[in-house]
Amino acid sequence: MTQPTHFHPSLLPLDGGINFRDLGGNLAADGRRIKRGLLFRSGSLDSLSAKDCDFLSRGPAAQIIDYRDADEVLSKPDVLWQGASYHNIPANPLSSEVNANLEKLTNETLATFDARAFMLELYRRLPFSNLAYKQLSGLLQNCASPEHATASIVQHCAVGKDRTGVGSALVLFALGADESTVLEDYLLTETTLAPFREHMLAQLSLKLNAQALGQFAFVLSAKEEFIQTALRSIQERYGSREQWLQQEFGLGSLEREKLQSYFLE
């Protein structure tokens, strides 16, 4: 993996990073901003170089939460750096109908595949009864506690878009960010993932036909319609994102205030 050609200030300077971004700097509660160097989102960590690991080890001790399925992890295990702790909690909905594991898509499955319907259903389901995001909530609260006040969190999936996109929305909302900030962060992936997406599609073009490749390209995109589907589903079920945070993840107003005291400046 080469250095990203579509540079953005939130991207970490990693040789083998995939869409590895710092959520720091985003506007959150009361006009405060998220501290840099504490909350990260990324794609797979399997291609990190020794230089990357040295760079990452200089920051706060990382709690890594890997949203990928077991077969994804087995195929491309994370490269861990010194001081990092690893948690693998799959975030895919408990259904064979929708699955963010893109490696399961083939010419045959893509032939009768409705990419848009697939993506919208994935985003309808991701926000609810999701053990991975419950784990994320717990890690956030642990990091904000006095005894763990030097820890950071890296949440990631395969490309850092869908499973990580909803997880990042959870973090941003818990810290008091508004919807426009959540949308902006999500849509940034369309740019920051571009080098890896182009590389992946070039490889897939060797084994997928044009129709299948077009479907795959759509699935690899970060469209506002996707994240808006998740946000609308949250609103329809709970009436507000605050109720969603409290009912699904135990993040009531008091818990959110504690997170904001630690993660914001």
Regions found by a protein language model. Name each.
Residues V159, R163-T164:
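Ser/Thr-glycine-rich phosphate-binding loops at phosphate-binding pockets of nucleotides
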Residues M1-V154, G167-E265:
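Cys-dependent protein tyrosine phosphatase-like superfamily
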